[in-house]
Amino acid sequence: MIHGYANSGRKNNRMNQEITNILKAYEKALNTSDTRAALALYGSGPVFMPQFSVALSGRDAVRAAYDKIFQTITLNVIFTIHEIVEMGDLAYVRTSSAGETKIHATNKMVRESNNELFIFRKEQGQWKIHRYLFASTNPPATA
């Protein structure tokens, strides 16, 4: 369930709804640990920049990253859209997400909270995730 919405760029309700729908599908893919569904939302040359990792370029690297993530954790998060800005065939979206993460190795539930930046690009008339970066808003764990 996506919350919130603000548009500080050029007004284009169709684009905003298309991108909002992609983010809803992405949220669902994360919450169902569905690599195939997540990857379907990415374009032909994606770059995924998860926290504490090098940038992962290309569909094979992004697929492998999601497979590894979903083997390690199960997410239960809700995204909030703060801003969508269109610039021709590119758009950027600033979001935050919050919820819980189950860590498979320990079977522990921990709080999940992130800021995200998505860059979308139109490919064959469809918006696709082109670049994606996230960083936790939780304080670092103390020893």
Protein language model regions, located:
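A beta-strand edge to alpha-helix "cap/lid" segment located at domain peripheries
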Residues: Y5, G9-A37, V47-A143
